[in-house]
Amino acid sequence: MKRTFLLQIAMIIVAAHACAQQKTDVQAHRGGRGLMPENTIPAMLHAVDLGVRTLELDCVISSDNKVVVSHDVYMSAAFIRKPDGTDITKEEEKQYALYTMTYDSIRKFDVGTKPYPQFPEQAKMKVYKPLLADLIDSVEAYVKKHHLKPVYYNIETKCSPDGDDKYHPKPDVFARMVMDVIKKKKIADRVTIQSFDVRTLQVIHKTDPKQTLALLIMNKETFAANLEKLGFTPAVYSPYYLLVTPELVKEAHDKKVQVLPWTVNEVSDMEKMMSLQVDGIISDYPDRLVKVAGSYQQK
């Protein structure tokens, strides 16, 4: 009898843990750059296969006003090669500002074959920076073809006050261009717009008040101080993971704000974040995170 009782208790604990796992939003940082070339269509499809709920990605604007998926506002020397196959040097990388280049020229640069020492597990392949519209089309078609649950998107606007009209348009124009793509693709209810720059969030909060917004945080100021700068309460507060404390999580949850730490790559840190009851985790290694938090696609 005692053994049966203990077994029942163990089963309840396991079931409760499984439920908790399914509540954690597993997000593939730049599509999971620890495994695949960052911010590319192959990375996103691979992340879907792994079982993530959300694809995290970044956007910039080209000279011909196309919304391009890219973290950097220029061609990074760390992992990009020129169309002729030669490496971009650190000294010249900022000469290749994407806002000064047409998308046709951007697409000719190889972002997937150069060895990337920071991510030794990353698969190597010749691939390019995609348009946001094309990435969404590819993911949506893939999900439909394989009869999967619809996935979500967490899209960062890569902008800053000192980059206006140099690396990107002003925030109102930037925000409108990104939202135009999202609305055209009819996925707004599955999209979060995130930014360190409060300006694009403020614009979208006014023009599209129902759009889910996330404030990215890297500073050590208080939750209240950061929200005061923003001017409204966002749906999501997304701090660097070492800034997450039990007190921060409670303060955010008391205001009905989700906490989404970035970028969490070690399993021990993932487990710690989950123990703090964060709402989601952004990771370069979604394979590790899925093992800890469970698969979104698991039936």
Tell me the role of every PLM-derived stretch.
Residues 1-23:
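Bacterial Sec-dependent N-terminal signal peptides
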Residues 19-299:
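Phosphate-group recognition and catalysis centered on beta-loop-alpha active-site segments
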